[in-house]
Design a protein with these regions (language model features):
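Structured catalytic-domain cores with a bias toward divalent-metal coordination
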Residues: 17-425
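Bacterial Sec-dependent N-terminal signal peptides
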Residues: 1-23
Length: 425
């Protein structure tokens, strides 16, 4: 009887909290008037609630359910403009090549044509070739360098194989290892050259399948371990230990450990940008919902959800109280429509669960913003789960992972009608 009573109490508590969040969503989802970022004069009045929620945060993470969500790209572009023009953010960090996009950007002559050329080759084409991002890459960012308030670019992804890394990473790494006295710690000059060849093979594999041969695996693994140990012994605080860890993470063969290592590396790369490269700047993070999620270490474990929920960049990053206080994580949600990445087929997004958050948003809202931080303060950060299509375009059943999404994201940007992005002409 006692067990039944306890279970009943827990159920009642969860139900009450669920009713609280439903009422909160219905009453506090703020309409957003437009996704159009191209207006010459924009007073951003409809984004005032976003600005108020963000407050003095130094990091704002902008998610997306899939890398083929056209309206989400448009919304993020307008949010980038708003954060840059009204909230003092001066760096846009993409889920793209940490070494190539960051180092290459430093070397770049900041002229409109050269900026466009560089971005097309050092940010994933999922975005740079999208018609929904065209204004951002071809106009807004390049033109910002004709003003007194330029928007700088950086990357934080540990996948180092885009244009600049493909052309320069091996040579730059060789120069670094020689100058740091690490090259001569290899067993022989031949072993060192085998390591460099394996690094280049791994970088080239994505564009030239077969470039990373099976016989390169051991030289790469052994070399990365040697370099990492030497860096640790030397207390190296440069970006190179992060690059080495990124290559290691990218070289792991099993998908789940590789993705976990990737997210950990992305969090470390972002911290480096904030503490070293752009130590006085506010940074906008452009990534997938799946990477920016917080508190995923507190969610249930299980083989069915480990890849999509466990050990995420946002979780690693906000474990540090310093960054937890200075970060606002904005997830994206949608009701219906299609999605589809460039180069792939479009697909219909899953309908929301009848009891899901999407059905609590007032039906007349095409776009809306919902701030969870006010709800969490009002109800002492309730951890009762509720349903939401997230981090992707489907609802994770509660039997697999009951999730309090109000603790995973600080807020949500809602789009009623999603559309698959199209290639820029």
């Amino acid at each position: 009887m006692k067990t039944l009573t306890t279970a009943a109490c827990l159920l009642l508590c969860a139900t009450a909290c669920g009713q609280d969040i439903r009422s909160y969503v219905m009453a506090n989802t703020v309409p957003v008037a437009t996704l159009d970022a191209t207006a010459a004069a924009d007073d951003y009045a409809d984004l005032a609630a976003v600005g108020q929620a963000i407050g003095e945060a130094r990091v704002v993470m902008l998610g997306e359910q899939d890398h083929g969500d056209g309206p989400a790209f448009q919304a993020k572009t307008r949010l980038v403009k708003y954060l840059h023009e009204r909230k003092g953010f001066t760096v846009l960090a993409f889920e793209s090549d940490f070494y190539g996009l960051t180092t290459g950007w430093d070397q770049l002559a900041k002229q409109p044509d050269s900026i466009q050329y560089f971005l097309q080759r050092n940010i994933f084409s999922l975005w740079t070739r999208s018609a929904d991002c065209r204004y951002l890459f071809e106009q807004y960012i390049p033109q910002s360098f004709q003003t007194a308030n330029p928007l700088h670019l950086s990357g934080f992804d540990s996948q180092h194989y885009l244009g600049y890394s493909y052309l320069h990473l091996r040579t730059d790494l060789d120069r670094y290892l020689v100058s740091a006295g690490i090259a001569n710690q290899f067993p022989s000059p031949a072993a060192y050259q085998q390591f460099l060849a394996a690094v280049q093979g791994r970088i080239a594999e994505m564009r030239t399948p077969g470039a990373f041969r099976p016989d390169m695996r051991k030289p790469l693994k052994d070399g990365l371990q040697l370099v990492s140990q030497a860096q640790l012994a030397a207390h190296d605080t440069s970006a190179w230990p992060l690059v080495i860890e990124g290559i290691r993470a990218f070289s792991l063969e099993e998908r789940v450990p590789s993705e976990w290592a990737r997210d950990k590396a992305m969090a470390d790369n972002l911290k480096f940008l904030l503490t070293t490269r752009y130590k006085d700047a506010k940074i906008i993070v452009w990534a997938a919902n799946q990477h920016i999620m917080k508190r995923t270490d507190q969610l249930p474990k299980g083989q069915k959800v480990d890849l999509i929920l466990r050990n995420k960049m946002g979780t690693y990053f906000t474990r540090d109280p310093q960054w937890a206080k200075q970060t606002y994580v904005l997830g994206f949600a949608s009701y219906q429509g299609t999605s589809g990445r460039l180069g792939g087929a479009s697909y219909p997004v899953q309908a929301p669960d009848q009891h899901g958050l999407e059905n609590w948003v007032p039906k007349g809202l095409a776009y809306g913003f919902l701030d969870f931080t006010a709800y969490n303060k009002q109800f002492n950060s309730p951890s009762a789960p509720f349903l939401l299509k997230s981090p992707s375009h489907y609802t994770i059943p509660a039997r697999f992972a009951p999730i309090p999404w109000n603790l995973v994201y600080d807020g949500l940007f809602f789009i009623r009608e999603m559309q698959a992005t199209k290639k820029s002409e």
